[in-house]
Amino acid sequence: LGEGVSLVRDMFVADTMEEAKEKAGEHMVNYMRWVCHWRGLGNHMDPGEELPETKGKLDLLNYEFLHKRNMLFGTPEYVIDKIKELKSELNLQNLQVWSNFPGVKHEDCMKSIKLFTEKVIPHFKDDLDTEVKKVS
């Protein structure tokens, strides 16, 4: 079927796990409330996973629910480990990161991107395909 998997992941890199949650966590959850209002939580669940019954379809949507499923929010080391896990489990070929969320301060977003480019990406330099390809 192909050589690997391409994924989009929400990303916020900070000096500590707590800082990532504090500076971007609630903004991410608020954004996902809007997205999941239409799509539900199914895109964030593992195959075969069943959630407990709740009154509202988004009652379980919080930072902890999202973080363990598809967020690259945390220290550079945490993000590196999560990317390695995705590569190992899914034969990850391409990773695209969504790095700005409504409400996150510009300077916090820029620091996160800087940490990602300076501390995370170098760990995957052998995997980078820098060839420019013509799209027809």
Where does each model-flagged region fall?
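An alpha-helical appendage that flanks or caps ligand/catalytic pockets
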Residues: 1-92, 125-136
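Flexible loop/turn segments at secondary-structure boundaries
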Residues: 14-16, 103-106
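Short amphipathic alpha-helical segments at helix-loop
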Residues: 64-67, 101, 105
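C-terminal helical cap(s) of enzyme catalytic domains, especially alpha/beta-barrels
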Residues: 105-129
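Conserved residues at the C-terminal ends of beta-strands
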Residues: 98
